[in-house]
From Swiss-Prot:
Keywords of the record: Aromatic hydrocarbons catabolism, FAD, Flavoprotein, Monooxygenase, NAD, NADP, Oxidoreductase
Family in the record: Belongs to the 3-hydroxybenzoate 6-hydroxylase family.
pH effect summary: Optimum pH is 8.4.
Protein name: 3-hydroxybenzoate 6-hydroxylase
Gene Ontology biological-process entries: catabolic process
Length: 400
């Protein structure tokens, strides 16, 4: 390539969903990629995640639409119940009318299956090298290249660096230096086999029960053979961001006042994973010469909009498009990528905080929430979602 005479790879710090999305987008632009992953193997942890139409637009743009579609479960609706009295607050059909409106379905899927689809796609290109047990420590750049020094003292040289190394991003720490914002909200996640899941709750829906300072989510996974269970509460103790083993006693202690139908979800999992959540204040710059940030490294968000993985994949697609229109000029492309993503991802971060407040409303605020959403037509819900689900590769770049 004209701007890469030494045929250097593009370096990607992080082999999660965002890093792999970036790798696929870069390969589609003709680059080879070296992924530096600090874990001993390329993999993913977690449970289920929700995928809006924007995620499927991203899958298609990255060339893995068929793989991802084959692993997803397609819901009939999104349903919200009040966790105190069990009443229906609202429902949003996600069938044919939804698909026609947004051009793609709404689905639920195991996070591991999203990662696997991306990983298979990257491996099949033959253009992505993976280095595991490799943690970026320091980055240097000059006019034509970037060098990443790892914990073993090795130097990795590339034409550019994508920092997709998560909430605790080393790349962000060097170039931005801000602190993560620990929310005090704790998420417990588990997967339950269908045979152990109550028949009365085996709905083909993304279901949420909203309560004071808490909520519960469940939906089917893997052809309906498993169910994802996610519960969130406001912790009584100081928290630090991270993932640990969950405690049945702890999670049960936070859901004493909810209705029996929702309460039974707490007793189902044999084991839980516990996430103390964090986000960051939105920033206006995350591109620095030949270095840029992507996914949680750029705009970590809480889970209330169900858009963390979706935003990372959108980032990858947008990055590829920015390179295309800038003839693979990385500094210029990174500027356009940043300009195209800052406002949208900031809106996700801030909207997610507000959605958490609405979900966890109590007292009179709870009554107002329920009245606002009861009886709302699907069309009104769809109109409110247009800014989110209307994203696609054709409109992803900022206009001059």
């Amino acid at each position: 390539m004209s701007d890469n005479p030494a045929d250097l790879p593009v370096l990607v710090a992080g082999g999660g969903i965002g890093g792999l999305a970036a790798a696929l987008a870069l390969v589609r632009r003709g680059f080879s990629v070296k992924v530096l992953e600090q874990a001993p193997e390329i993999g993913e942890i977690g449970a289920g995640i929700q995928l809006g139409p924007n995620a499927f637009h991203a899958f298609d743009a990255l060339g893995i639409g068929e793989k991802a579609r084959g692993r997803a479960v397609y819901t009939d609706e999104m349903v919200m119940h009040d966790a105190i009295d069990g009443s229906l607050v609202g429902r949003i059909p996600t069938g044919e009318a939804f698909r026609q409106r947004f051009g793609n379905p709404y689905a639920v899927i195991h996070r591991v299956d999203v990662h696997l689809s991306l990983l298979e796609g990257a491996q099949e290109t033959g253009k992505v090298e993976f280095l595991t047990s490799t943690r970026a420590l320091r980055i240097e750049q000059d006019e034509g290249s970037v060098t990443v020094y790892d914990q073993h003292g090795n130097a990795h040289k590339g034409i550019a660096l994508i920092g997709a190394d998560g909430v605790k991003s080393v790349v962000r720490e060097q170039f931005v230096g801000d602190a993560a914002r620990v929310t005090g909200h704790v998420v417990y996640r588990a997967v339950v086999d269908k045979k152990d899941f109550p028949e009365s709750l085996q709905w083909n829906a993304a279901s949420i029960w909203v309560g004071p300072n808490c909520h519960l989510v469940h939906y089917p996974l893997r052809g309906g053979e498993q169910y994802n269970v996610v519960v969130t509460f406001h912790s009584r103790q100081p928290e630090q961001w991270g993932v640990t083993e969950g405690s049945k006693e702890e999670v049960q202690s936070y859901f004493q006042g909810i209705c029996p139908q929702a309460r039974q979800l707490i007793d189902l999992p044999k084991t839980w994973k516990r996430w103390a959540t964090a986000d960051r204040e939105p920033i206006g710059q995350w591109s620095f010469g030949r270095v840029t940030l992507l996914g949680d490294a750029a705009h970590p968000t809480t889970q209330y909009m169900a858009q963390g993985a979706c935003m990372a994949m959108e980032d990858g697609v947008t990055l590829g498009e920015a390179l295309r229109v800038n003839n693979n000029d990385f500094p210029k492309a990174f500027e356009l990528y940043q300009r195209s993503r800052v406002a949208r991802t900031a809106r996700i971060v801030l909207s997610s905080r507000e959605m958490g407040r609405i979900y966890h409303a109590q007292g009179v605020e709870r009554l107002v929430r329920n009245d606002l959403w009861k009886g709302r037509t699907p069309e009104r819900f769809y109109d409110a979602m247009e800014w989110l689900y209307g994203w696609n590769v054709g409109n992803c770049l900022a206009k001059d």
